């Protein structure tokens, strides 16, 4: 194969998701010819603001907002065809051409209505039994990945063969309806309106699921592709590719705050497995991190603040940062920047550089705290532990840093930032050992400070 001059960049979240990856992916696609989603499902939410217009995406790569950029959904994504077409139709109404530019891997496992039903039932059963909820979005992501790992999933390619699809579907329904009946017996809850058309007497019915899947199949066929082959051919031809991670490192099923995690690998290494592009072709790993920390749902959060009481720094972050989930609308928990957490993320991702987002949210705070380590059971440590129970016992060790009252909104040159903002960023670099490549100073695409371009040659 001919040597390529193309450069491939992986973008990953370094915290618990919601770091602002969508904006940065959109910004970077000016230098890319293709953008790839490689894990997760429609539980992820990316918000883009372009010329003042806000667009929320859940499945389709953020590069779709750049005319001419090809977008790929890789084999590591679990796909709800219904949600995909909802998103396509919304973009088309806004004048965005999607279908000719989007390719979907035939190897993607499908999310079907019984996956969402299982997700909802399990969370209800946990709550009924007195256990803390995991905090899933209830969209069927986890159960769909379970079917994949158990080697029984229906995949996109199965949609091309109705008889094969029907036979596999009947087998899956027999299994999952049995499990559903067990959950229904242990918790009193109701399925939401979105699931009611598929369920009779607490059981997911074959006909509505099959008929809907066949309708989706006809619409999806023109976009089905061998995504691995297309990406490798594009790379060989010299194209720059961008791999767009969803969620964040601390939600990774292996490296996150287990069990309060998602069901996929969110780390940079999965960009290869989830797309079919070899790891030797991934040239730069950009870690996206907020200038503070947020988390949605349950699980330990060492630097969490009181974010509900007016007048507190946490409340400032929550309100000024508009910290509500794109997918669920749930309020995000807020806390100080955690450099010990970021050091863990830097290790497991092999970060080449950082992009600090939402720096402008800290405008007006006169004093900031930066977590540089923890005290755990009487011992000082400077790296986030692996276990959720240990993380929950961590007491943050803070450095206090002077804040700033000047506005950073819209600043596009580093030297124009307030001096205290520069000191804060430089201290983050020193403690984490990762150079800052980019800084975001508002949700707008153009409000970005570039220090080192990820697509520039080393």
Swiss-Prot record:
InterPro entries: Adenylosuccin_syn_GTP-bd (IPR018220), Adenylosuccin_syn_Lys_AS (IPR033128), Adenylosuccinate_synth_dom1 (IPR042109), Adenylosuccinate_synth_dom2 (IPR042110), Adenylosuccinate_synth_dom3 (IPR042111), Adenylosuccinate_synthetase (IPR001114), P-loop_NTPase (IPR027417). Keywords: Cytoplasm, GTP-binding, Ligase, Magnesium, Metal-binding, Nucleotide-binding, Purine biosynthesis. HAMAP family: Adenylosucc_synth (MF_00011). The gene is purA. Mg(2+) binds at residues 18, 45. IMP binds at residues 18-21, 43-46, 137, 151, 247, 262, 330. This is Adenylosuccinate synthetase. It catalyses: IMP + L-aspartate + GTP = N(6)-(1,2-dicarboxyethyl)-AMP + GDP + phosphate + 2 H(+).
